[in-house]
């Protein structure tokens, strides 16, 4: 049976929402969940304080706080929930890990505990962005604020394999995020990356502007360095929230508008669901030798449930082995 280690102490709403999401996951999936953290706090949110079937508690006495230096905290707090959860994956006691705690700490724990896939210089966080054409991938969204051209090529390769393995997109279109679609546009990084992507065994379609991302037609996988990707991700989240707040204010401003709002309410609910980050669960850290799913710090029960779902799908897909298999072909193309 598949086993998913869940950092029960990580996140703004831990351990309550984490435990709820884990319990919901065992109702839907044939998996075992290992809740990692402080047993007495975890049990407060279990039915009658009892540990149900297919749930196990692994004690971890320490917690990495959000304001701590990630790498230092991971090295110092050997018995923290994120370090212990990562160790379970490394030692084969769990098939994947999920955490809504410090992203930096999870990255550090994953790099130190799981290690990079041989041939991958830097890992990347990949996220699914909602678009008019369904979910599309953006990476890197924060693992590394800076990158070299060869790193972006590796991101493109991993993103392409992930899109095919997890999203079921055949021969995914890969685009390079830029300030214009022309080949000569951009800074030194994008201009140096463009010819490398042209040479790579990918379905590279060229540069993609930021405004094209929400429409989802230009590319299935959009590649950029982590600084830019994180700005795009958080701007998208903020814009979606602001738009829905504005719509709510305007359609309820008068009695007549309120009547009209009733007619469009089902459609608005569908849009809200499509834009809800909790529906997409978590963002995998690609390039490490194990499955490490990074969840939003404010994750609720639904987000944790979906993060566990993503972890399950990653285990089932075997995409890490696919990355290792495809890497030599990409490396040879760059020589």
Curated annotation (Swiss-Prot):
One of its GO terms (cellular component) is cytoplasm. It holds the Pfam family FA_synthesis. It is found in: Cytoplasm. Keywords: Cytoplasm, Lipid biosynthesis, Lipid metabolism, Phospholipid biosynthesis, Phospholipid metabolism, Transferase. It comes from the Bacteria. It catalyses: a fatty acyl-[ACP] + phosphate = an acyl phosphate + holo-[ACP]. Its EC number is 2.3.1.274. GO terms for molecular function: phosphate:acyl-[acyl carrier protein] acyltransferase activity. One of its GO terms (biological process) is phospholipid biosynthetic process. Its main location: cytoplasm. Pathway: Lipid metabolism; phospholipid metabolism. Catalyzes the reversible formation of acyl-phosphate (acyl-PO(4)) from acyl-[acyl-carrier-protein] (acyl-ACP). This enzyme utilizes acyl-ACP as fatty acyl donor, but not acyl-CoA. Homodimer. Probably interacts with PlsY. NCBIfam families: plsX. Belongs to the PlsX family. This is Phosphate acyltransferase. It comes from Desulfitobacterium hafniense (strain Y51).
């Amino acid at each position: 049976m598949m086993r998913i280690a869940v950092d029960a102490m990580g996140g703004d709403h831990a351990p309550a929402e984490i435990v709820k999401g884990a319990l919901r996951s065992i109702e839907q999936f044939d998996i075992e969940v290992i809740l990692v953290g402080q047993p007495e706090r975890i049990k407060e949110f279990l039915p009658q304080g009892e540990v149900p079937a297919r749930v196990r508690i692994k004690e971890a006495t320490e917690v990495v706080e959000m304001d701590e230096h990630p790498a230092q905290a991971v090295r110092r707090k050997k018995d923290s929930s994120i370090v212990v959860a990562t160790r379970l994956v490394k030692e084969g006691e769990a098939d994947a890990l999920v955490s809504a705690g410090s992203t930096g700490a999870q990255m550090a724990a994953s790099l130190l505990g799981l290690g990079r896939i041989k041939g991958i210089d830097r890992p990347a966080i990949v996220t699914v962005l909602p678009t008019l054409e369904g979910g599309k991938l953006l990476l890197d969204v924060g693992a590394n604020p800076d990158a070299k051209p060869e790193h972006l090529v590796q991101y493109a390769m991993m993103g392409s394999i992930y899109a095919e393995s997890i999203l079921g997109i055949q021969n995914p279109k890969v685009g390079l995020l830029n300030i214009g679609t022309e080949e000569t546009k951009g800074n030194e990084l994008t201009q140096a990356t463009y010819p490398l992507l042209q040479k790579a065994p990918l379905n590279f379609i060229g540069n993609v502007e930021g405004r094209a991302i929400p429409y989802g037609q230009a590319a299935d996988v959009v590649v950029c360095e982590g600084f830019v990707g994180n700005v795009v991700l958080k701007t998208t989240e903020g814009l979606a929230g602001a738009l829905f707040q504005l719509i709510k204010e305007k359609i309820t401003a008068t009695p007549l508008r309120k009547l009209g709002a009733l007619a469009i309410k089902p459609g608005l609910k569908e849009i809200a669901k499509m834009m809800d980050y909790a529906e997409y669960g978590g963002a995998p850290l690609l390039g490490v030798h194990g499955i490490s799913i990074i969840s939003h710090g404010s994750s609720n029960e639904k987000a944790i449930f979906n993060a566990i779902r993503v972890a399950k799908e990653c285990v089932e897909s075997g995409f890490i082995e696919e990355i290792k298999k495809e890497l030599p072909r990409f490396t040879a193309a760059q020589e």
